[in-house]
Regions:
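Conserved short loop/turn motifs at secondary-structure junctions
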Residues: 33-36, 65-73, 95-104, 127, ...
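Long, charged, mostly alpha-helical binding arms that flank functional sites
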Residues: 253-332
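Secondary-structure transition/capping motifs at alpha-helix termini
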Residues: 21-25, 53-61, 85-95, 116, ...
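N-terminal catalytic cores of NTP/NDP-binding nucleotidyl/phosphoryl-transfer enzymes
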Residues: 6-16, 20-83, 199-230
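A glycine-rich helix N-cap at a beta->alpha junction
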Residues: 78-103, 109-112, 117-120
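Active-site cores that bind ATP or allylic diphosphates and position pyrophosphate for catalysis
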Residues: 68-70, 76, 98, 115-274, ...
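Residue-level signal for inorganic ion chemistry
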Residues: 22, 51, 82, 113, ...
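Core subunits and conserved enzymes of cellular information-processing
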Residues: 233, 237, 241-243, 309, ...
Length: 559
């Protein structure tokens, strides 16, 4: 085995062992099986990268299969959103499948199991079924309908299929072992009546298969060789195999279920119920709110597919659930955007600065490098004039030696422009600074080659020409929760940890070239972070989302 094909995790070791034991490489087939009842999140992204990554490594197909067995919660809009997310991550499935494609075959197999006395119709209430199943420390007991005749079971099951009965009258259960130490093996439900229209099959079916019955059989129909699930499905593996035993042809590939750990990201929640609560209570503005770790939210915030894939690759595949610091994801985002994003200047909290010795009415076009990491990006022209905007925090009337920005009597360089010295400021009646006065060194123009231009000063500030400034709306997004694990506190609801400062909206002043940016395009606001053009942008107002700061601002907070 060459180094390129050497296993990098225990999942690949499983596959390599199977290949050594006689499984043909051509028989490898994988799948990603989401339920279309919500939007995918960062945890799903890791599973997508795992399965499609295996397909790429071994050069074998990966199916996208929708586990659409619950018409009460599933919608076509989720199917479309999930397909878009997978494509955006850079993957292409081999076959698009739906569990609903197999409803007839699953039904036929269930009928055969009834005939083989391995399934029966139970007419108990859900409460009665739960009670007679026992507990982890107490074995279950046989229910009163467990030994119904085959003929009666067939008639009842057909009646369920034809809509003869209500939702709570009957269920079909597998006949396994009510004393099993694995409660999932205590005659699990295979079918229930659901009087709801299905997003694909309409009103054709009145009964719908349960997940455990559908999953393994769908894998078998598609001839999936390896079915990878998260750790909560480990107890389900015994049932997965038992159901396969009822239908498998030994001449065909028998799917193998194996489990890996969830990779949770700090300061987030991924439970669909909790994400739904955030949306419904107006904490966020929809499923694609840039504070959400849904794939659509991350995409809108300005995350790149490369950053998410590199993140997934870097944390690997584990056997124990773990919490990954959000900073690790942000590291890969910064690393990608540092190379991909052009630099621009935008002042988030502007205060006017007047260069008193610069000629009134004079304007210049200065050269500014688009990306110092990539010389091929070239330069752009940035207008300069007597009045400019700088960040309010970049000026203090009096400052100590550790303040390397602008203060009275001290010099700083304006990025791509001149060295200036602060002379004083004008304040309003409340004592707020409304205008700064400075002088410039006419010979210090950046790139001019003069001795003055090569003078070293400790601070460099970004700025925007006041007469050319483009007002823009900037949404300063931060982490949605104030603690790393908001949903693990046993005494407090996760909503109590919502960060009240997760969004601040400001009107900023941007250099005029930014008006040509397209929705979804990400740039670096120099010294401030990476920002993405939001879909709320209109012809009259550009809107930017803060994708990520230039450095981790939470490192000290979480210590």
């Amino acid at each position: 085995m060459n180094a390129e094909n050497k296993p990098t995790n225990f999942i690949e070791e499983i596959i390599e062992d199977d290949l050594k034991n006689g499984l043909s490489k051509e028989d490898l087939r994988f799948r990603f099986p989401p339920e279309p009842n919500g939007f995918l999140h960062i945890g799903h992204a890791s599973a997508i990268c795992l399965n499609f990554g295996l397909g790429e490594k071994y050069g074998q197909p990966v199916n996208l299969r929708f586990d659409d067995t619950n018409p009460a919660k599933e919608e076509a809009k989720y199917v479309d959103a999930i397909k878009e997310d997978v494509k955006w991550l850079g993957y292409q499935w081999d076959e698009l499948r739906f569990a609903s494609d197999y409803f007839q075959e699953l039904y036929d197999w269930a009928v055969q199991m009834i005939k083989d006395n391995k399934a029966y119709v139970d007419s108990q209430s859900s409460e009665e079924i739960a009670q007679q199943k026992g507990s982890p420390t107490q074995p279950g007991v046989d229910g009163p309908y467990r030994n119904r005749s085959v003929a009666e079971n067939l008639a009842l099951f057909e009646g369920m299929k034809n809509g003869k009965y209500g939702a709570s009258e009957h269920v079909l259960r597998a006949k396994i072992n009510m004393q099993s130490t694995n409660m999932l093996m205590r005659d699990p439900i295979m079918y229930r009546v659901v009087n709801r229209s299905h997003h694909r099959t309409g009103d054709t079916w009145k009964i719908y298969p349960m997940y455990d019955w559908t999953h393994g059989e769908s894998d078998y129909i598609e001839q999936i060789s390896h079915s990878f699930c998260t750790l909560e499905f480990l107890p389900h593996r015994e049932l997965y195999d038992w159901f396969l035993d009822q239908v498998v042809d030994p001449k065909k590939i028998r799917p193998k279920q194996r489990e890996f750990a969830r990779r949770n990201v700090s300061h987030t929640v991924t439970s669909k119920r909790k994400l739904q609560k955030l949306v419904e209570q107006g904490v966020v503005n929809g499923w694609d709110d840039p504070r959400m770790t849904t794939i659509s939210g991350l995409r809108r915030r300005g995350y790149t597919a490369a950053a998410i894939k590199n993140f997934a690759a870097s944390i690997g595949i584990a056997k124990r659930d773990n919490l990954i610091d959000m900073n690790h994801l942000e590291f890969h985002l910064r690393d990608d955007l540092n190379k991909a994003a052009n630099r621009v200047m935008c002042v988030l909290d502007p205060v006017k600065l007047v260069i008193t010795n610069y000629p009134e009415g004079k304007e210049e076009l200065l050269d500014a490098e688009n990306n110092q990491e990539d010389e091929t990006r070239g330069y752009r022209k940035v207008p300069f004039s007597r009045e400019i905007y700088i960040e309010r925090e970049d000026y203090k009337e009096q400052a100590n030696k550790k303040f390397f920005r602008l203060s009275n009597g001290r010099e700083v360089r304006l990025k791509n422009a001149y060295i200036i010295k602060a002379e004083g400021c004008i304040k309003d009646d409340q004592g707020n600074i409304k205008e700064i006065h400075a002088t410039y060194d006419i010979d210090s123009k950046s790139g001019s080659g003069t001795e003055a231009s090569m003078r070293r000063v400790k601070g460099t500030l970004h700025w925007v020409s006041a007469s050319h400034a483009l007002p823009v709306e900037v949404r300063l997004y931060d982490r949605l929760f104030t603690v790393p694990s908001p949903d693990t506190d046993k005494e407090k609801d996760f909503m109590e940890f919502v960060n009240p400062q997760s969004l601040e909206v400001v009107t900023a002043m941007a250099e005029p070239a930014m008006k040509d940016l397209k929705i979804g395009e990400t740039v670096q606001f120099q010294r401030m972070g990476y920002f993405c053009v939001d879909s709320d942008t209109t012809e009259n107002l550009m809107v930017f989302n803060r994708t990520v700061t230039l450095r981790d601002t939470w490192a000290k907070v979480d210590v």
